[in-house]
């Protein structure tokens, strides 16, 4: 850790056009901030010129550091890689698409100097479609009843964390990471900073409906076992209904005699029970799959190249070329 240094982690996936823009915006903001800073780009397997744009910046600005993954490992892995390699006494996580306004950095640092370990940006839903806003609102109402942490609508990864908070996060070694939940789980003193939603100016969002749905599922499954308990309670409820139905049918037979079998009732019951069983198996399978993933102990990411001094990092292409030339001579 370096005192007086603020580290900024920027996960980047196909953000070639935005890399230099976010760099210029950060440089402008830090002219009025009395901390030194480093900008840490994490290239998450981009297929455009993101890495080259980052390299060009690093060649002219010593404050620019980067790690480039061997493939796309996802934003969670990119954030973790940043936490594991930055040197600052405080760390800011933000996106490369300019939807996280850099003017909030002053508010972040102000909150940090007031003693807060997490200064969190919370945005409104301006610019989002009605359907997305509605689904988001419903999701957060549901998830906060289901999980053991308090997740806020409009709060994402955009925040400042103290070194103490970062070190606490690094102690959490699970393979299936859900940063929103982890940030809440570690606790510490928190301050909320509100801001207006900023629409993306360049490129397109990397979040499709299916990826958002899967991310939401991660939030539900990663932080509680209530879905498993729900399967148990559902089973008890259906068992009680079945007993009541059997007793009612038996009484009806005793009073009215045996009637023609109710095929509709039988088919409905079979389909209903089949659906409940498949849903329960799906929930159980999700948990078992995560346990299986955890037992593999695979690394969260693999680094292809980087410009940070670390003996455990692979050689960059430039260093490889220099080594070959040295051997030839």
UniProtKB/Swiss-Prot annotation:
Subcellular location(s) of the protein: Cell membrane
Coiled-coil boundaries: none
CDD domains assigned to the protein according to its UniProt record, in alphabetical order: DPM1_like_bac
Transmembrane segments: 231-251, 264-284
Gene Ontology CC: one annotated term: plasma membrane
Class in the EC hierarchy, top level: transferase
Protein name: Putative glycosyltransferase CsbB
Species of the source: Bacillus subtilis (strain 168)
């Amino acid at each position: 850790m370096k005192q007086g240094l603020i580290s900024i982690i920027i996960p980047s996936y196909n953000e070639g056009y935005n890399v230099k823009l976010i760099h210029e915006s950060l440089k402008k903001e830090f002219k009025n901030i009395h901390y030194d800073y480093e900008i840490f780009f994490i290239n998450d397997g981009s297929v455009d010129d993101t890495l080259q744009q980052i390299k060009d910046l690093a060649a002219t600005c010593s404050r620019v550091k980067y790690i480039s993954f061997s493939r796309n490992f996802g934003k969670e892995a990119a954030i973790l890689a940043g936490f594991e390699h930055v040197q600052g006494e405080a760390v800011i996580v933000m996106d490369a698409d300019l939807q996280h306004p850099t003017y909030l950095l002053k508010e972040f640092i102000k909150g940090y100097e007031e003693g807060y370990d997490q200064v969190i940006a919370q945005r409104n839903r301006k610019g989002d479609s009605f359907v997305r806003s509605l689904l988001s609102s419903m999701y957060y109402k549901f998830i906060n009843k289901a999980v053991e942490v308090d997740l806020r609508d409009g709060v994402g990864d955009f925040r400042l964390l103290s070194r103490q908070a970062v070190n606490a996060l690094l102690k959490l070694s699970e393979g299936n990471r859900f940063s929103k939940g982890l940030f809440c789980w570690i606790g510490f003193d928190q301050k909320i900073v509100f801001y207006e939603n900023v629409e993306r100016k360049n490129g397109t969002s990397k979040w499709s409906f299916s990826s958002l749905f899967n991310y939401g599922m991660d939030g539900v499954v990663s932080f509680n076992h209530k879905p498993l308990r729900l399967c148990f309670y559902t089973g008890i409820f259906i068992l009680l209904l079945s007993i009541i139905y059997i007793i009612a049918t038996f009484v009806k037979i005793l009073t009215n005699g045996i009637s023609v079998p109710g095929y509709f009732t039988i088919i409905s019951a079979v389909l209903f029970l089949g659906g409940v069983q498949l849903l329960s198996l799906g929930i159980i399978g999700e948990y078992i799959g995560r346990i299986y993933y955890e037992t593999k102990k695979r690394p969260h990411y693999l680094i292809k190249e980087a410009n940070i001094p670390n003996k455990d990092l692979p050689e960059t292409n430039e260093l490889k070329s220099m080594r070959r030339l040295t051997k030839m001579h």
